Amino acid sequence: MRWSDRLLKNALTPGLAFALLLAGCGFQLRGEQKLPFDTIFLNTPPNSPLGATLSRQIRSGTDTRTVPQASEASAVLEILGEARDKDILTLNAQGRAVEYKLIYRLRFRLHDGKGREYIGPTELRAQRDISINDSQVLSKESEETLLYRDMQTDLVQQLLRRIAAVRPHADQG
């Protein structure tokens, strides 16, 4: 066996073994999410970042269409509220906060617009820790903004997974 053949064999074997392990454990890239509704109305405040994120995720990651009127939709996603909180985790010797816990909460419900509730009022919650250094206040503010945006995206993904688990015709006879 030539040196180049042996090198090729030694390089391919671990890669092939790794690929087989991943395939065997069920790992797969996140593909298109299947929502059980053809159309959905997003009841969010106009020009809200949350509404824009929801709409973008539904448009790009599902085959469900968003519609402008609740009467046209087979499901209505109602955002009941969202909140951002910031709790102090750690104080330094001078009594200044050096570490915070950022919390993002999202409350929603999903119904058909005609009285049938698919998901009752539910709160999703995400949190991240952030440390603060007095010399890096401005960069930490932008990091805080990015962390809140990241948490919002995470909660939108959780929300879409919950919607995907809904069985709209399960208890109809």
Please place each PLM-identified region on the residue numbering.
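C-terminal motif of bacterial Sec signal peptides marking the signal peptidase cleavage site
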Residues: 21-24
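Surface-exposed short loop/turn segments
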Residues: 78-123, 129-145, 161
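Acidic/histidine-rich, surface-exposed loop or edge segments in extracytoplasmic proteins
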Residues: 34-41, 135-141
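C-terminal/domain-edge helix-coil "capping" segments
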Residues: 138-173
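Bacterial signal peptide processing site
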Residues: 26-28
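Bacterial N-terminal signal peptides that target proteins for export
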Residues: 2-14
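N-terminal segment of the mature soluble domain
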Residues: 36-83
